[in-house]
Structure formats: C-alpha cells, structure tokens
Amino acid sequence: MRSSSLPGARSPRRNGSGQSRHRLPPGRLRTGSRAPTAEARPHVARSPPTPGTGARGGGRRGWGGSRAAPQRGSCASANAQKQLRQTAATYMLTARGGSRSAERKGDLQRTFRQVGQTMPMVPPLDFTMNAASVE
C-alpha cells in the first residue's frame, strides 16, 4: 500500500480537492484562483479611497499607506504588492518614523543615566516603622 493513498497523507489543499464544490456557483466551477476579478470580487470598493486618510494600511505615523505608490487598489500583482510592502517598511524605518524614535529613546536613556549620577543617594523609606507608630 502506498503511503500517499492514505487519507491524511496529502493535504486536500495541495490536491485541489479540498474546495467544497457545492458552494461554488456553476459559473466559477474549477476556474481556480484565476477567475476574472471584476465579477469574482464584488466586495472590493469601486471608488478609490479619499487621499490623505491613509485608508490603505500603514497609518502608524499619520501619513497614508506606502508613500512610494499611492493607492494602487487591489489590482497589483503579488510581486508588486510585496515590493510595495517592502518600500513601505523601509520608509517606516528610515523616514521620520522608527529611527527618530530610536534616537529619542537613546537620548532619554542618556538623560536618565546623567540624572542618576548627579542625584544624591536617597535612602529607601522604611514603612514598617511608620505603620507601627500610627497604630
């Protein structure tokens, strides 16, 4: 008996038999992922999002998604989207975003260290004596 004939040997996704055929409308039967996007995805917004709102992700710093290619919609290919994501990530790191906050963090740590050196040593308060004297 071949091991691949066992039921759990091969995942149904790899085989392509994992799709529930009764749920697909008859027009899209066995078309796979290359179905025409206009009919297959009616949930995608037809009108582009208003500029400046950052509707497409990445709005952590207040500016909209990837600044390199504004609002490409969902028609970009997978490779193009990967590149967009990469450029957006580099923008996040190199522009005002990440590196500046890292600098600020370093500055804060430096000032705290200096404050710690200049401040005189304060002995910790002993609360047990205060509690005993109140009673």
Curated annotation (Swiss-Prot):
Chain residue ranges for the region called Disordered: 1-80
Gene coding for it: MED14OS
Composition skew (Gly residues), residue ranges: 54-65
Name of the protein described by the UniProt record: Putative uncharacterized protein MED14OS
